[in-house]
Amino acid sequence: MRNETLTLSSPAKLNLFLHITGRRPDGYHELQTLFQLLDYGDSLSFTPRDDQRITLEPSLPGVPEADNLIIKAARLLKEHITATSPDKAGQISGVSIYINKKLPMGGGIGGGSSNAATTLLALNRLWNADINTETLAALGLKLGADVPVFVRGATAFAEGVGDILHPVDTQEKWYLVVHPNLHISTAKIFSDKWLTRDTPKSTIAPALEGDLENLRNDCETVVCRMYPEIREAINWLDQFSPARLTGTGACIFASFSDKKRAEYVLSQMPTKYQGFVAKSINESPVLNELKQWRNH
């Protein structure tokens, strides 16, 4: 095992649309969505330790360590290796993890899920576990429905509970992502009795052709009813380009053909909001970073 620090990106995602097409007997929702990766996000650094401790700095406000997806991902991977490859268990060291956090929590842009995926990918490499992507994605699904798309590292059309992924190439666009400084509970939205749960299944074609007019986020109506501040933010952004919610929020977004226009709108954003401009990408930077690490 190389005793040096591995630093990897942890990109954001948008749900360009989100259709809820049914509900399974176990309570999980069937959905269709287009996960669009962005060239903006957190970064995580992993440094092997001489002991067996797994530590994270800085700790995230309001998130107990046991509930942090980064720590949970590290422990899950360690348990999996110990159970399935006892011969490799001796290679597992402790690890100090440092996060440079840019993405808001509870924003619907995949911050926690992306962090978990990056942790699985990083420690698989640091611990020389040689676990394939399929298995890592399955482990990721235990942590959250959005984790597998980040493990696979590609913009994708998703079905099932978000775990059946079809990689796609989307047209390059610039996005302005606005966070109205609210935290929205995904569980609260998905349990709301007024949530649309019977949207007819769509094909992948409209999403790829950019025909988002006929696609929507089924959570948006419920979220806007519960949180009028989200409707207010959407109305503001709508002045410049059609805006919509990503995931269950709280972030909203709009697309622009060029960076300059997106940055101009960002400069006009009310000070009560936070926001950033990012370019769409079809492949996660983590994949290339891991290749460079291997060749380093």
Curated annotation (Swiss-Prot):
Disulphide-bonded residues: none
Catalytic site: 13, 146
Binding sites annotated in the UniProt record for ATP: 104-114
E.C. number(s) listed in UniProt: 2.7.1.148
Top-level EC class: transferase
GO molecular function: 4-(cytidine 5'-diphospho)-2-C-methyl-D-erythritol kinase activity; ATP binding
Gene Ontology biological process terms, A to Z: isopentenyl diphosphate biosynthetic process, methylerythritol 4-phosphate pathway; terpenoid biosynthetic process
Catalytic activity, reaction form: 4-CDP-2-C-methyl-D-erythritol + ATP = 4-CDP-2-C-methyl-D-erythritol 2-phosphate + ADP + H(+)
Keywords in alphabetical order: ATP-binding, Isoprene biosynthesis, Kinase, Nucleotide-binding, Transferase
Family of the protein in this entry: Belongs to the GHMP kinase family. IspE subfamily.
NCBIfam families: ispE
Protein name: 4-diphosphocytidyl-2-C-methyl-D-erythritol kinase
Gene of this entry: ispE
